[in-house]
Amino acid sequence: MKEKTYEFFSSIQTTEVEWLWYPYIPYGKITILQGDPGEGKSTFILNIAARLTKGKDMPDGFKTSMAYPVIYQCAEDNPSDTIKPRLVAAGADCSKVAFIVDSDMNLTLDDSRIETTVQEVGARLLILDPLQSFMVQDGDMHSASRMRSILGRLAVIAENVNSSSEIFEQL
C-alpha cells in the first residue's frame, strides 16, 4: 500500500501562540528585525531584553509573566566596552544575559552550541546580531532555499525549547 503524502487540516489540533510581546514577538518562532545601520535596532531589542530579564512590562503595557534569561550574541561589538554598558543603560539584569564564547570556532547558525546554551541557560529569548555574521561559509543569503534551510534549524530550536529567536539583518 502506498504511503499517504497528505493530511487534512481537520485532523490537526489547534494550539494557542504564546507571546513574549503580543503581537510582535512570539515564543517558539523566529522574528526578524531588519533595517539600515544606525536606525536603533540594537537599542530597541536590548530594551526588550532588559525588560524580560527583570519581568517588566513591554513598552505598550503587555505583561510579562516573570523574569527570564536571555542570550545576546553580537558579532560586531565588544562585550566589555559596548555590549555590557548598553545592557546596563537599558536596565538589564546582567546576571540573566548570557553569550556563547566563540574563541576557538566561529559561531554559525548550524552550531550545536546554540541549542545547548539555550537549554542550559533556560533562555526565553535568543538574539543574533547581525544575521550575516552567523551564516555558514557556504550560506548564500540571496538564495531563498538556502536561507530556509539555514533558518530551519534555528526555528526547530525555538519551537523545541519554546524560546523566541530574534535575528537582526542589516540592509
Predicted regions and their residues:
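Gly/Ala-rich phosphate-binding loop of Rossmann-like dinucleotide-binding domains
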Residues: 53
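Hydrophobic positions on the alpha1 helix immediately C-terminal to the Walker A/P-loop
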Residues: 44, 48
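Structural recognition of the conserved hydrophobic beta-strand(s) that form the central parallel beta-sheet
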Residues: 73, 127-128, 162-170
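Conserved inter-motif catalytic segment of the P-loop NTP-binding fold
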Residues: 6-9, 15-16, 20-22, 26, ...
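Charged, amphipathic alpha-helical linker segments immediately N-terminal to NTP-binding catalytic cores
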Residues: 1-4
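Helix-to-beta-strand junctions that scaffold the AdoMet/dcAdoMet cofactor pocket
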Residues: 159
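Walker A (P-loop) ATP-phosphate-binding motif of ABC ATPase nucleotide-binding domains
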Residues: 30
